[in-house]
Amino acid sequence: MNNLIITTRQSPVRLLVDYVATTILWTLFALFIFLFAMDLLTGYYWQSEARSRLQFYFLLAVANAVVLIVWALYNKLRFQKQQHHAAYQYTPQEYAESLAIPDELYQQLQKSHRMSVHFTSQGQIKMVVSEKALVRA
């Protein structure tokens, strides 16, 4: 995902804290998994009544993993093709026609960074006065 919708800048300290916390938590998670697997191999869990409960949790985890994998594959197939078409590139003449103004007035709109736009009573653009002309007047 190179084109993120929301991008926020973080300070290097905040980024470092995030990376360190993530590394510590993943290390602890791996340690807990390792210790649990070692206890399973020693046979202690298999001698108690917790065996059926552990089997249920294991089957539940496997079913959850299967559902997540199927859902991810479905989304990959669903969103594999680009659904949004690129926006149509209008020409300056088409813009001028859509605003019902002459090409010269459209060019003046394009050149001005700051302007005052005057409209007719029907809401069409009548005149554009750029900021330079406003300052001189």
UniProtKB/Swiss-Prot annotation:
Induction: Levels of this protein are positively controlled by the second messenger c-di-GMP (at protein level) at a post-transcriptional level. Increased levels of c-di-GMP lead to increased levels of PgaD. Residues 1-23, 75-137 are cytoplasmic. Disruption phenotype: Cells lacking this gene do not synthesize PGA. The chain crosses the membrane at residues 24-44, 54-74. It comes from the Bacteria. Residues 45-53 are periplasmic. It is a multi-pass membrane protein. It is found in: Cell inner membrane. Keywords: Cell inner membrane, Cell membrane, Membrane, Transmembrane, Transmembrane helix. One of its GO terms (cellular component) is plasma membrane. One of its GO terms (biological process) is cell adhesion involved in single-species biofilm formation. Required for the synthesis of poly-beta-1,6-N-acetyl-D-glucosamine (PGA), a biofilm adhesin polysaccharide. May assist the glycosyltransferase PgaC in the polymerization of PGA. NCBIfam families: PGA_PgaD (TIGR03940), PRK14585.1 (NF011180). This is Biofilm PGA synthesis protein PgaD. The lineage of its organism: Bacteria, Pseudomonadati, Pseudomonadota, Gammaproteobacteria, Enterobacterales.
